Amino acid sequence: MNNPALPALYAQHLSVLKQRADEALARSGFDHLVVPSGTQHWQVFDDRDYPYAVNPQFKHWLPLTRLPYSWLVYTPGRRPQVIYYQPHDYWHVVPDAPNGWWVEHFDIHIIRKPEDALALLPNPAAHCAILGEPQSALGAAPDGIYIPNNPQAAIDYLEYQRSYKTPYEIALMREAQRLAVRGHRAAEAAFRDGASEFAIHMAYCGAVGQDANDLPYGNIIALNEHAAVLHYTDMGRSPPALAHSFLIDAGASCHGYASDITRTYAADPAGEFQALVDAVDAAQRKMGSAVRAGVDYKQLHVDAHLQLMAILKDFGMITVSPEAALATGVSAAFFPHGLGHPIGLQVHDVAGFAASDRGGRIERPAGHPYLRMTRVLEPGMVVTIEPGLYFIDMLLEEVKKNGHAGSVDWKRVEAFRPCGGIRIEDDVLCTHGKPENLTRPAFAQAA
């Protein structure tokens, strides 16, 4: 990534994190913030490890995603420290020597064995707020055991504040968009060439330069009726005899930050399914333009149901009004997931339900159990906007069982079933004014 502004943006970002850490420690009554990067995990009855996943609290401070057995230590008023695990190992590639825009801001201690960190961690352990997984525990009595205690007051505050992205974070998320769009373009080309789902996936990974261990989530590459499976990840090795549609939900990572993008393509650009895709795309753009400060995300979700049902009404697939389809649950059969979620260090980022930085929960509206965001939007938040329309046999059968078969024109629905469904997703930044769509400009630049 070649962004000359990044060092200055990172310095500002680090200043914000220090201020947040000061408050989190004050609220939780601890003297030191200690964040392990995480450990390798091993498969049961085997000597093979699972892919390493860094602690999100660690990569919030440091652009390091492949550094197990390391630690961040922050004490208010002092220079932060990084305990950097770089073993002597001829079996595996070891982490590079510390380098990059972050190095000048930390005291760095190289260790060769995980237990070497004990001599460098603040003492006593009881004075430390340790944020991590249980497997990161280090030490033994009587000298002290550094067991992640995850004090709730600190977690509540830090996760809530993560909703407000710094300019540094936005810069990395923009780059994650650019990388993902490169893959989306390659995937669409492979689809147009008649490739299988697996071959499309490989084209995507090759264009992005990331594999399953790097991508922020497993790619969804769905041809035809497979698009009716919301998280379809099977990836058929052979192409279908006749391609009708292609749904791709795939992102990319940039120094620990994620993008999450979905597009749907029709094999026949002059067909009725293409017209339906175009209608959902237009509605999705409108939904994205509503990501404004002070708007309740729950209301955006309900409004999305009404807009999508209006499309189905226009296409003759439902016989009732959008309002009636929503009230009777018919809309949930066609749009069974939430409008979106927060995104950042994690694809489904934290604090989507948080009532405040002191805890509490804002519940989902009744009848919408899969919504992942219930907060009022504020500047600095980044959310996905991902409406969808699907033809899922199981859910459509429930419409019939619930006595609402007359609300649906089944012949019209049957005509679209071979296409599976449609989902279109962008990542959108809430600002003090107009929202900034982070995804669409990346597609325009890659055209």
Where are these regions (language model features)?
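Active-site neighborhoods and metal-handling regions in enzymes and metal-associated proteins
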Residues: M1-A447
